Amino acid sequence: MRDDHIKKTIAVYDTMADAYAKKLNDYAPLPEREKFVTLLSSHAHILDVGCGPGRDAEFYVAKGFSVTGVDFSEKLLEIARRRVPHATFYKQDFRSLRFPKQSFDGVWACASLLHLKRHEVPMVLNKFFQLLKSGGVLFIMVKEGKGEADVAEELSSYLSRHFTYFQREELKRLLENTGFEIIEQYTYNEKDRRPDHRDLWWISSFSRKP
């Protein structure tokens, strides 16, 4: 079925929502959040795609930004609404986001596109492009690697989630084919930031709509 990977992942997040929300703070992409702030104008409107329990939305609201968050999981959204009452949250499939064109100054997609199938990603990037204003900034963080897999790990209470892995050049090509201009793109390993974390490589990508 077309949506089996999404339904399975939603079920995992709904099941472990409270435990996941407590663990997630330790995995915040601190340097990336600070850089994203420098790329936006004051009072910018940010779309947080795959906002989860509101960890990053809380940070951006505290910085004075307007934040709209979307997620597949209603249980995570319930936590986000309690945690960040000054942000707005919707349950939406980010393969078919329902907002007017050029609504946002920034799109923050941290560890969210990795739950899609590879063939779905170009369509979603095109939607991000449409939703951003001219000069708007897109941040994407995905796991580096090859292929797709269902993976159970401690962060997800050993329940299996779907992941698609990317190469740097592949992601760069996808963004440029959509029309984005790359600002900066790099990889890092979790253990380089927190020695007690996973030996896991991530790609962080900042790009801009001309």
Language-model segment annotations:
Residues 1-41:
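Conserved class I S-adenosyl-L-methionine
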Residues 47, 53-96:
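Class I SAM-dependent methyltransferase SAM/SAH-binding core
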Residues 95-107:
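A short acidic, Gly/Pro-enriched loop at the edge of an enzyme's catalytic core
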Residues 122-134:
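A short glycine-rich, Lys/Arg-flanked "PGG" loop and its adjoining helix->strand segment in the class I
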Residues 135-142:
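Conserved beta-strand signature within the Rossmann-like core of class I S-adenosyl-L-methionine
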Residues 153-169:
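Acceptor-substrate binding/catalytic loop of class I
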Residues 180-191:
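Conserved S-adenosyl-L-methionine
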Residues 191-210:
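Core SAM-dependent methyltransferase catalytic element
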